[in-house]
Amino acid sequence: VIGGDECNINEHRSLVAFFNSTGFFCSGTLVNEEWVLSAAHCDSTNFQMKLGVHSKKVLNEDEQTRNPKEKFICPNKKNDEVLDKDIMLIKLDSRVSNSEHIAPLSLPSSPPSVGSVCHIMGWGSITPIKETYPDVPYCANINLLDDEVCQAGYPELLAEYRTLCAGILEGGKDTCGGDSGGPLICNGQFQGIVSYGAHPCGQSLKPGIYTKVFDYSDWIQSIIAGNTDASCPP
């Protein structure tokens, strides 16, 4: 996250850190005691998820590590289009209980409205060009913008993609490399998943692109309920 500050240790209890053999690479959001939501482009072989992390160098007493038991990506996702259905639901190999630094974030009850203030968080780069990765997550507030702003800034963003556009028009506050899969929380509701953006991060008129969680709520709830053949919206 660029243009932000170190998150308060208690304001990211649902944020999950993903690690593979090369180290930290993505985030996710705990949606209940057994399930994490992330971006499809964060799928990796043999990764672990750590919950309750603040500093990657200092262990919290209640930190928990889990492995993916099952991973679900939309069966109708166009794999050659990174922006299409960039969402992945992960079942943990065992449940996690709430603690001082761990708590789930529920799915949204309604879609967000343009103009909402949204909160971003992550261990991604805090500098736009030469990437600098912090040990602690950074947080910032940005605005939910009209989809047309992102369609103008990104010709590859098709109108039918179920995405949200969020940032600051003049630039300077944005998610960045390493923030993928983390949450966009608008007016206290979990509305987006960090999916895509410009390089360097934080350019004017090139806000971040987030998968629109609300549109996938039925799919998510179906899979959690055990209907693993559920299909995503087109």
From Swiss-Prot:
It comes from the Eukaryota. Disulfide bonds join 7-139, 26-42, 74-232, 118-186, 150-165, 176-201. Glycans are attached at residue 20. Keywords: Disulfide bond, Glycoprotein, Hydrolase, Protease, Secreted, Serine protease, Toxin. Pfam families: Trypsin (PF00089). Residues 1-225 form the Peptidase S1 domain. One of its GO terms (biological process) is modulation of process of another organism. It is an enzyme of class 3 (hydrolase). The active site is at 41 (charge relay system), 86 (charge relay system), 180 (charge relay system). Its main location: secreted. Expressed by the venom gland. Its EC number is 3.4.21.-. GO terms for molecular function: serine-type endopeptidase activity; serine-type peptidase activity; toxin activity. It is found in: Secreted. InterPro entries: Peptidase_S1_PA, Peptidase_S1_PA_chymotrypsin, Peptidase_S1A, Trypsin_dom, TRYPSIN_HIS, TRYPSIN_SER. GO terms for cellular component: extracellular region; secretory granule. The keyword Ligase does not apply. Belongs to the peptidase S1 family. Snake venom subfamily. Monomer. Bradykinin-releasing enzyme. Releases bradykinin from bovine HMW kininogen. Has anticoagulant activity. Increases permeability of capillaries by intradermal injection into rabbits. Negative results: does not show a thrombin-like activity. This is Bradykinin-releasing enzyme KR-E-1.
